[in-house]
């Protein structure tokens, strides 16, 4: 059902703000040292994060999602659920066809909405840089269990590609940007191109590709079964294994009881050499998702698709979203990455 890779490529991860680890690496022999990682604690996590952002994701992550209204609201990309809608923002300058960034909100797979991003920001900056933006909703775990969420995400990509001419979009230049739960989904978009069992072709436009050409993963959960062990020995709560955790609710059972299904939520199990380039970011003080989750994803991708196609940065002192991700400098880093592959 899925492919596994033994990861031997190891990257030293300095914790300076926005340190670029994988971009520009040369082909020298990898070091045998382990990645340097700052261990997050509940005390180091911003108080407001613990108060308003349940694992993994939640409302309030981004102060401003967009200052402009969508050009098109509630476009239905499938017809099985009222949740299967997207908002589309089109730049007001430029002639197009425009490259597209699909934004996938966070919220622990339990809540969040396309109108607020739930952990995302940057619509204004994307529009100014000449990108169309499609912010999607998907079925949440109280309505449908996994793989409905990745089915919906892929259906949205196929819908946009099928209707690219109508909306003046470039069907060959699609990126995906997600935060927290959305980070997991965009990482799957970037690694499961052509994986039939995760396609959900019955949702429509089956003749279209659901592949994306660039991925921005903000602090997404990657390996559900490893999270509590990775938090062991820290003051961060280790509750992902609980029967009522967001991850267990996503798959419809305690995660330890359905390891084969849980394995299909892990992007690292699908990495191949033709995967999309990735920008991966997390905070060093994230007490919701262990920072090593995204470090491991970056290393696994780098070993297979090449270090030049993977950029990893760790934001010193940042938690699970928040203002550190929203700075002009960091948003420009995202735009620069997307420009490299989509413009």
Explain the meaning of each model-derived region:
Residues 61-67, 191, 195, 226-270:
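Mobile cap/lid helix-loop segments that gate and shape the active-site cleft of serine hydrolases
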Residues 53-96:
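N-terminal cap/lid segment of alpha/beta-hydrolase-fold proteins
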Residues 97-108:
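Short beta-strand element of the alpha/beta-hydrolase
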Residues 115-134:
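Short amphipathic alpha-helix adjacent to the substrate-entry channel of hydrolases
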Residues 274, 279-282, 286:
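Short beta-strand/loop motif that positions the catalytic acidic residue
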Residues 287-296:
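Conserved alpha/beta-hydrolase "acid-adjacent" motif
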Residues 144-165, 332:
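Alpha/beta-hydrolase active-site loop
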Residues 155-232:
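Primarily recognizes the serine-hydrolase "nucleophile elbow" in alpha/beta-hydrolase
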């Amino acid at each position: 059902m899925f492919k596994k890779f033994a990861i031997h490529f190891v990257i030293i991860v300095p914790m300076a703000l926005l340190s670029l680890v994988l971009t520009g690496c040369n082909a020298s022999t990898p070091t045998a040292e382990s990645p340097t990682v700052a261990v997050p604690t509940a005390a180091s996590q911003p108080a407001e994060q613990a108060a308003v952002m349940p694992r993994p994701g939640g409302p309030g992550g981004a102060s401003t999602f967009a200052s402009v209204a969508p050009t098109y609201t509630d476009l239905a990309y499938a017809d099985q659920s009222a949740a299967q809608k997207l908002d589309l923002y089109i730049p007001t300058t430029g002639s197009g066809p425009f490259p597209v960034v699909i934004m996938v909100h966070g919220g622990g797979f339990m809540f969040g909405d396309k109108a607020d991003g739930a952990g995302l920001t940057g619509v204004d900056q994307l529009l100014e840089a000449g990108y169309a933006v499609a912010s999607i909703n998907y079925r949440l775990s109280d309505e449908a269990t996994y793989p409905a969420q990745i089915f919906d995400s892929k259906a949205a990509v196929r819908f946009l590609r099928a209707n690219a001419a109508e909306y003046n979009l470039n069907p060959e230049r699609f990126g995906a940007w997600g935060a927290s739960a959305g980070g997991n989904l965009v990482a799957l978009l970037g690694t499961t191109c052509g994986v039939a069992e995760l396609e959900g072709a019955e949702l429509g436009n089956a003749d279209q590709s659901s592949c994306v050409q660039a991925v921005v993963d903000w602090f997404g959960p990657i390996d559900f079964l490893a999270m509590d062990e990775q938090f062991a020995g820290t003051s961060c709560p280790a509750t992902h294994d609980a029967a009522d955790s967001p991850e267990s609710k996503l798959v419809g059972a305690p995660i330890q009881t359905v390891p084969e299904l849980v394995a299909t939520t892990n992007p690292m199990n699908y990495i191949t050499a033709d995967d999309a380039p990735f920008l991966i970011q997390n905070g060093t003080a994230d007490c919701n998702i262990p920072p090593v989750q995204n470090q491991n994803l970056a290393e696994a991708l780098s070993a297979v698709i090449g270090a030049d196609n993977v950029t990893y940065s760790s934001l010193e002192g940042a938690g699970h979203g928040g203002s550190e991700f929203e700075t002009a400098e960091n948003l420009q880093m995202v735009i620069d990455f997307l420009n490299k592959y989509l413009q």
